[in-house]
């Protein structure tokens, strides 16, 4: 995604260093998209990449130069984005710059303690693309810190009653210019598809609302069906010249919601949070890394292609979602090039910590379950440890990178939500609940950052 603009933010910097007190970070502006700061580097084919069992260093540029100043770090950020797009995500179109919203319906909920609006967004070529989002706000005056929460369920308030969708047909696996070749069979759509009553949805968010957070939620497949046929619907026919996998498309869609939310009086645009679970945690990782308007990223149970480092996921390494498993089952999430790392994962020139490093100096937390078999704690720990040098370089507290484990399997629980809210309170609102967000299940982790054989 091209840069939207620049903003200067003054942050405290360690006085013993030679760095300036003005830390320039990429952030939002309502101006038109600017060109990228540097041309994309020429990147080698997978077969020509070196074997690298250790986590690739975020502070070393492609030419081997060590990052020692902010100008170099900005260039390094662009390199990292280019690498992630080339080998994993694909390339997305620029922001359309024309997002608008129309209220479809509204009502009070929770006995007057909160308000609900169903909003239809329009954008893209001739504003022919759209999304329906549900906005829940606490009663009273805003602006409120706002959580954007992609959901597996239908957008609350939408009148849609076709229930579970049938499996999609097998698609042509040799379609040129797409990532369809990574998929050889149809996958059923994930569709928890009955309408969701706004009052019922508000009850599920009552804790968040009572703590002073607004919630924007929406059905994620509006941003691309979760199957190999995703290119035939949603945004993709409007942008035929892009090779993005659906994971990047989902993240791009979340950023269109940010386009709208940051213009609304209910939202404190300096306190926008993205939180999603499982594959929606993966999209949270991508969106937070590539959209600097998101003040805090909170992927939950995101597993492989999320918080879990590829080098520590998969057969013989722990968890289920290594690069082999992800590209075999979910190849349409990515560009086909990622599948070329099957059997040679140590050639990956990146890993999950790059998404966290791109988030710096903004706060980020991974919310996990101790018994989530999709991703073992060590894969998460390696990601967190490998990203922290960027936060140290930028002179901000290491507690801006957090992790929290609750006792459960692959799920998003009320305890997970409370951990994320406590972390957001601490990082964005100056409310310290006395919690530590740096604890891992000790017996399941290691400080060794080299992938096991």
Locations of regions flagged by a protein language model:
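Cap/lid segment of the alpha/beta-hydrolase catalytic domain
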Residues: 149-263, 303-313
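Alpha/beta-hydrolase-fold serine-hydrolase catalytic core, especially in secreted/extracellular enzymes
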Residues: 39-132, 137-142, 156-159, 168, ...
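Bacterial N-terminal signal peptides
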Residues: 22-35
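Bacterial N-terminal signal peptides that target proteins for export
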Residues: 8, 13-25
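Alpha/beta-hydrolase fold nucleophile elbow
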Residues: 266-278
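Hydrolase active-site cap/lid region
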Residues: 285-334
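Loop/turn elements at helix/coil->beta-strand transitions in domains of secreted/extracellular proteins
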Residues: 142-147, 211-215, 268-271, 292-296, ...
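Glycine-rich nucleophile elbow surrounding the catalytic serine of serine-hydrolase chemistry
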Residues: 276-286
